[in-house]
Amino acid sequence: MNKKFKYKKSLLAAILSATLLAGCDGGGSGSSSDTPPVDSGTGSLPEVKPDPTPNPEPTPEPTPDPEPTPEPIPDPEPTPEPEPEPVPTKTGYLTLGGSQRVTGATCNGESSDGFTFKPGEDVTCVAGNTTIATFNTQSEAARSLRAVEKVSFSLEDAQELAGSDDKKSNAVSLVTSSNSCPANTEQVCLTFSSVIESKRFDSLYKQIDLAPEEFKKLVNEEVENNAATDKAPSTHTSPVVPVTTPGTKPDLNASFVSANAEQFYQYQPTEIILSEGRLVDSQGYGVAGVNYYTNSGRGVTGENGEFSFSWGETISFGIDTFELGSVRGNKSTIALTELGDEVRGANIDQLIHRYSTTGQNNTRVVPDDVRKVFAEYPNVINEIINLSLSNGATLGEGEQVVNLPNEFIEQFNTGQAKEIDTAICAKTDGCNEARWFSLTTRNVNDGQIQGVINKLWGVDTNYKSVSKFHVFHDSTNFYGSTGNARGQAVVNISNAAFPILMARNDKNYWLAFGEKRAWDKNELAYITEAPSLVEPENVTRDTATFNLPFISLGQVGEGKLMVIGNPHYNSILRCPNGYSWNGGVNKDGQCTLNSDPDDMKNFMENVLRYLSDDKWKPDAKASMTVGTNLDTVYFKRHGQVTGNSAAFDFHPDFAGISVEHLSSYGDLDPQEMPLLILNGFEYVTQVGNDPYAIPLRADTSKPKLTQQDVTDLIAYLNKGGSVLIMENVMSNLKEESASGFVRLLDAAGLSMALNKSVVNNDPQGYPNRVRQQRATGIWVYERYPAVDGALPYTIDSKTGEVKWKYQVENKPDDKPKLEVASWLEDVDGKQETRYAFIDEADHKTEDSLKAAKEKIFAAFPGLKECTNPAYHYEVNCLEYRPGTGVPVTGGMYVPQYTQLSLNADTAKAMVQAADLGTNIQRLYQHELYFRTNGRKGERLSSVDLERLYQNMSVWLWNDTSYRYEEGKNDELGFKTFTEFLNCYANDAYAGGTKCSADLKKSLVDNNMIYGDGSSKAGMMNPSYPLNYMEKPLTRLMLGRSWWDLNIKVDVEKYPGAVSEEGQNVTETISLYSNPTKWFAGNMQSTGLWAPAQKEVTIKSNANVPVTVTVALADDLTGREKHEVALNRPPRVTKTYSLDASGTVKFKVPYGGLIYIKGNSSTNESASFTFTGVVKAPFYKDGAWKNDLNSPAPLGELESDAFVYTTPKKNLNASNYTGGLEQFANDLDTFASSMNDFYGRDSEDGKHRMFTYKNLPGHKHRFTNDVQISIGDAHSGYPVMNSSFSPNSTTLPTTPLNDWLIWHEVGHNAAETPLTVPGATEVANNVLALYMQDRYLGKMNRVADDITVAPEYLEESNNQAWARGGAGDRLLMYAQLKEWAEKNFDIKKWYPDGTPLPEFYSEREGMKGWNLFQLMHRKARGDEVSNDKFGGKNYCAESNGNAADTLMLCASWVAQTDLSEFFKKWNPGANAYQLPGASEMSFEGGVSQSAYNTLASLDLPKPEQGPETINQVTEHKMSAE
């Protein structure tokens, strides 16, 4: 990157003096974020309490004892003493908040992320050329701190910032905004890619004494929008700083250890932060085709869901601009469900399942068609598809299910979500049904559960051995491939039940214990190439994590109920060695296949023996009668079919078992009939035309068990009988017809309402998926793409140590992602991707295989075959990976079945995943440790904390009513677990426990809940700002409070308490829904507030159903930067369906503004009557509808084109001389200008405006909140902004001089042809440049950098796009506009007599935009003068390469051959680097076929092309 900028150095003085100190063009984004109060953990703070083991100090002076007394005080100077460490050297770390490390700066001349210092000497830290912090370290000389070697210094405690909160706030704001690894949560990277960036930082740091709002505007425009590209769905940075308890030390030897101290030890190869991750769905199957963004780069998840990230950094996942969610990269397997809170996470999982196809090994593949549809709704897609809606049984509540209406799925039946859904389903041959969740963690001692599992798995040598457990796949048929593995979740919801089998979901889940890992514990590939000495470690149970169970066992009285989540296991009873694929029975009753191993026969024998209480044993000549309501078993085979059928019976190998068919269950004797094998429902055997329908799933509308049957069965179980159910229940079991089945399972402490499969496919699939396997051997070249022009790691030739660049530079966001190498080939004029992947099954001869290898070697010169035959996951070479032997099916390479490895270690690890009581107690003790400054409790290691926290979030983040049952074994700790719940829920959970007096006192004493003497008695204290790493139990209960209204949260700080009583209000609401684009939607503000925990009723008089939303707020769950400093509940928004002429009643946990969205195709309104609400300030149609002093804490302004939400005091608008009227007019002017930029001037058709007066109720939305999901602001509906100052009387947004609102709304509106690959954070800013030109007279954003653009293009060797960041790439569009200013005449396209649309401009400085406006219109199919210029619209046609379209469109519209310009920029390209190469390589961009096409048009070359432009046009502004 230095090379890229070297030519800029000579211009620094001019650039800096001209612009840096001038602010942001007279005004800025207005983006403001209150930096949360931070408890500093700086090393300069003296230790509060003595080290508990100070004895080494007085005694270690065995040499003369001249003065043994001076020890208490260091002033006798330690030098006379002969100890080896009189003033021990220590290692310091510059941090934010004591825990978030700052890298890229220097302290005392060394890296700020690990520098040496001697206690007593000052520490001086420099970033760029500016001293940003000085610390006095005298306190570290205390003898009590001798053992503490690692010390964190918080920037906030720097001497330069002492005594000024504004300086502290501004310094943190600048540092976080300058962060070059924005997705990382543990580090902030001050690594400047150019001298320009460094000087910009220096200049701004000198201005930190400005008012925070003014300073923030400077930062937003000068720093944030020059961000490096490809770091996140949005490269915006977050100003949130971790909140830590004062006095903590990042040293494990300290008396008070910080929560994330372990990260300060991660320096060896196995501890390196850079990791390989795997994105999986709720069943543990890899999810391919999802965009992911880290500071280490961006990419698309590989064939098995693989991605690269920096350990501990935030990884953001999305599809195009659709933000699925973010998660902290602290484990090897990231489940979709972890990308949000449990509801949101399950919805993400459902969304991906719905819009994905089935790949190899049941992986999910998001096809390009989904991306293309989403791209039509940039950023606004985030509001159209609401990931926060309740989703029936899809709550990700650990092993618990929240039985809510599936509003998430229902949203696809209306509005723009329906339009998107319809478009995707049409392009992908239909959409899948929804599904469900994932679990991690452990801690249970051996006991009954372990013993039973050992028996059933055959670990107990008295039982039959089971080493490979067979998992059947769904009988769907996509591209000839069978469906995903199906082990439907069977969750234990009380201690009466426990799991029998849970499939692994850790990063190396498909590798058995003892095998070499494919990924290290940081989810990185092992770099084993010479001279590295890294050795892959073995897979062990210590690193195993598990999904929810799909086989569980519950107790009812003396009896046992076992449920297995797939009906095909019945076929094993019929043909125990012929069930896996295309089995069956011939006319003689003989099994047609007999080749399957004995494992599943052994398992079934173990099950039959155990459930019959040894009344039947294999090989023992015992007899047993089994009762059943099954007539038929079905064998798995190819196709969307039920499979070959046979009468339900037992194979002769199960000797002595006879079958009796039952239709009722009264008075059954367990001694005579010890076991029943039942189904709860009829099978679905006819799937019609639905390609996603699963044959043999339970038809919950046709129950086979009546309530009387269930009563009889419970009686039978109570007497000691056993019931085995093998069934696939794909329902949340809300149906009345399912109530009997639900009751039966509930009696045993079980639930199948989770409605998801929980078994991962083996890693097979399309060629672009890393770490995959096929049935036969494969050859694959997997690599890490280059970062900033170099490999992302180095190997020390002497030590063999691997060092990852992102770690050395402290840029966790730069963590690379493993990929299968690919290249583009020109095939018939289209660019097609080829992957460095060979399946030996495709090559029948050695010559054919050799030729395939040679093709790869030719594409990647210097590439060699891998050399270690004992390890099959090497990277940076052509690797051979043996096959699995399991046949794969169809074009998606899905295996016929999945196998799970079972052994004693697996059994042990699995049981340890489910101990709720121990887990919650350990998290409580960890929180006590931090709440008492280390005096009480016990700190968990950060690794254990993450595991326990993630596991408990699965169990707690739902509204499942857990219970403890006396007299039953409680190995899962339900007694302790429910006691904690009752302390927070005011003993709402009836059953065997209540909140004990001792636990309640402890919680009250430690400020976790409010005591009886408080005015807030019965509420929990959310302890904002809340860091889950220090207060995990509080965070877990705060998360649960969204679902469980028995947990009442103190809302005084956020969103604000309302003391007034609710009232009855009737409002008339528009129901009309006809948006041009989703980001200018028809959600209607009511001006009413739903108070927290109070019942609200809404009565509708509308003739159409509507959606009611309370509170517009992002979901922060899993957003790591926010999780360490939450200032509000992570999930706030609630959504309800309200039927036509119906009534809805609800309580919301925290309060919020109420919104209503109708879906009427006609322009109509209806009245709604609200009960229990209070009014909120509401300025609409130029007047106060509800006055400013209304009781709600938030208010809104509604103009013709915008709805603006903000704390009510802001609506005083004291910074606007024209008050709210002027502000509303400015918002509308911006909206109108945006219509102009995109060439939209009509009320219908191709060029329909986003908003206009004849489209009532459809408006852009902009909402301010105390914390938002990503960055200072982000796009969507609404656009969200983190400016939240409840005590300010000023509005934080200035619509006609505000880069932030232009940038974010520009995200929403960005359209082809500007949106090429890599332009996510660029194309939107072209609108902002247009606004600067139109209202400020000059493109200030690019005015300086464009002066050196021609030199940059020469330096970049025709790869300027790939080498540049967002700021550099914006120059391409700016050069094109400035060239068009003098070289493009719009009138040529509008012949005489054709009126020129009014949005075109002849004003100086605006004429160049005419080119862009016409390009936009042409891309939408505008036909004006097409016949005059060749008849073919090159803007509206695509060969699949967006960069080709951009070049051809621009050249055709300009009627000029711009090939030289596009060759120098090569938009759409990206860079990578081969192992050992010293130079970058590039791929993608404009194809040769596009240049050929352009040449064939025979357009004139420009005399001076856009590539020569080095200045912007400046227009002296007058009022427009």
UniProtKB/Swiss-Prot annotation:
<dbReference type="GO" id="GO:0005886">
    <property type="term" value="C:plasma membrane"/>
</dbReference>
<dbReference type="InterPro" id="IPR031161">
    <property type="entry name" value="Peptidase_M60_dom"/>
</dbReference>
<keyword id="KW-0997">Cell inner membrane</keyword>
<dbReference type="Pfam" id="PF13402">
    <property type="entry name" value="Peptidase_M60"/>
</dbReference>
<feature type="lipid moiety-binding region" description="S-diacylglycerol cysteine">
    <location>
        <position position="24"/>
    </location>
</feature>
<comment type="similarity">
    <text>To V.cholerae AcfD (VC_0845).</text>
</comment>
<feature type="signal peptide">
    <location>
        <begin position="1"/>
        <end position="23"/>
    </location>
</feature>
<dbReference type="Pfam" id="PF13322">
    <property type="entry name" value="DUF4092"/>
</dbReference>
<keyword id="KW-1003">Cell membrane</keyword>
<dbReference type="InterPro" id="IPR025385">
    <property type="entry name" value="DUF4092"/>
</dbReference>
<keyword id="KW-0564">Palmitate</keyword>
<feature type="compositionally biased region" description="Polar residues">
    <location>
        <begin position="97"/>
        <end position="107"/>
    </location>
</feature>
<keyword id="KW-0449">Lipoprotein</keyword>
<feature type="compositionally biased region" description="Low complexity">
    <location>
        <begin position="234"/>
        <end position="247"/>
    </location>
</feature>
<feature type="region of interest" description="Disordered">
    <location>
        <begin position="22"/>
        <end position="107"/>
    </location>
</feature>
<protein>
    <recommendedName>
        <fullName>Putative lipoprotein AcfD homolog</fullName>
    </recommendedName>
</protein>
<dbReference type="InterPro" id="IPR035423">
    <property type="entry name" value="M60-like_N"/>
</dbReference>
<feature type="compositionally biased region" description="Pro residues">
    <location>
        <begin position="51"/>
        <end position="77"/>
    </location>
</feature>
<dbReference type="GO" id="GO:0044325">
    <property type="term" value="F:transmembrane transporter binding"/>
</dbReference>
<feature type="region of interest" description="Disordered">
    <location>
        <begin position="1498"/>
        <end position="1520"/>
    </location>
</feature>
<keyword id="KW-0472">Membrane</keyword>
<keyword id="KW-0732">Signal</keyword>
<dbReference type="InterPro" id="IPR051244">
    <property type="entry name" value="TCAF"/>
</dbReference>
<dbReference type="Pfam" id="PF17291">
    <property type="entry name" value="M60-like_N"/>
</dbReference>
<feature type="region of interest" description="Disordered">
    <location>
        <begin position="226"/>
        <end position="247"/>
    </location>
</feature>
<comment type="function">
    <text>Involved in a type II secretion system (T2SS, formerly general secretion pathway, GSP) for the export of folded proteins across the outer membrane.</text>
</comment>
<feature type="domain" description="Peptidase M60">
    <location>
        <begin position="1081"/>
        <end position="1381"/>
    </location>
</feature>
<dbReference type="InterPro" id="IPR042279">
    <property type="entry name" value="Pep_M60_3"/>
</dbReference>
<feature type="compositionally biased region" description="Low complexity">
    <location>
        <begin position="31"/>
        <end position="42"/>
    </location>
</feature>
<feature type="lipid moiety-binding region" description="N-palmitoyl cysteine">
    <location>
        <position position="24"/>
    </location>
</feature>
